Amino acid sequence: MEIKKLINNSLKVSLSIMLGGLILYWMYRDFDFKTVADTLMHGMNWTWMLLSFPFGILAQMFRGWRWHLTLEPIGEKARTSTSINSIFLSYAVSLIVPRIGEFARCGILRRYDGVSFPKALGTVVMERAIDSALVMLIALITFFLQLHVFNTFFTETGTNLESILSKFSAAGYAVTAVCAIAVLILAWYLLRRFAIYNKVRDMIRGIWQGIMSIRTVKHPWLFVAFTIGIWASYFLHYYLTFFCFEATAHLGMACALVTFIVGSIAVIVPTPNGAGPWHFAVKTMLILYGVGDVDALNFVLIVHSVQTLLVVALGVYAWTVLSFTRTKGGVMV
């Protein structure tokens, strides 16, 4: 069983890396990488890149502070430093195995501060749900404000927006809902047939309790402030890189917001740090705003690579700090 699980996990990781690699290969198959070296040495303003770093760090710190806030109402007390370092490390490990970071940070709090894993995971689910809703809201607003750009995008990619929307109907939604309910009922029935049912039930209860913690957050406005801080910092971390390159310095905040949102949605595809899907989505939108193909390819490759290196550096820092951190019981692990 363990071998089978290891094989399945290895296949998932391999397929994820292959998918990202294939997209990048297709995008850069005829690309002259000498232009990247020339841009790095002579064609970009590194001052703006360095100025973007504090916002990348601050975004993860805000996430750590917010997580610490959501754990308090459910009786779980984690050290703020552990919460932040767990966030740093979770992003780094997700570069290897996409989406594993959510579980990793819960495991870190369990190991160092004795926090309940299911409850911690519940708060993570709650955070992700809120973040997803916020991104979708911003995406809808951006979509309507920049509708002409998105229409051009669908035309350029050979996709007709009207044909996509016409496929959705009341009957279609009803059938989808019925199928989803049927699957849930079947899953519930099958779980009851196995001994693992009680464990799964307890896990779900813990997750639900974590989700409900949003209702009992002691400082709701602080939670909102942290959430805004997270996404404002992520955006500034990205937006300031526009000023590093002559081809993007003049594009303005509207273009930055559109490409930021499109890139944020693209990373839903499970590849390491969104490599591949993010490059394609952002590069395509930049071209629609008038950026040349070579300049757009340079931009996405350099920005993504540098920001990934920052994630790695923060992960190494967190791992080092945690290596010298004692558990609440006074044991160094």
Regions found by a protein language model. Name each.
Residues 89-98, 258-279:
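Transmembrane alpha-helix interface/packing and boundary motifs in multi-pass membrane proteins
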Residues 55, 63, 67, 94-105, ...:
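Alpha-helical transmembrane segments and their lipid-water interface positions
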Residues 80-83, 102, 115-127, 136, ...:
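Membrane-interface alpha-helices at helix entry/exit sites of multi-pass transporters
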Residues 72, 85-114:
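Extended non-transmembrane interhelical loops and adjacent amphipathic helices
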Residues 1-88, 145, 151-267, 306-333:
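Predominantly cytoplasmic-facing regulatory/coupling regions of multi-pass membrane proteins
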Residues 109-116, 210, 280-298:
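Interfacial segments of multi-pass membrane proteins
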Residues 89-90, 94, 122-134, 226, ...:
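Alpha-helical transmembrane segments of multi-pass membrane proteins
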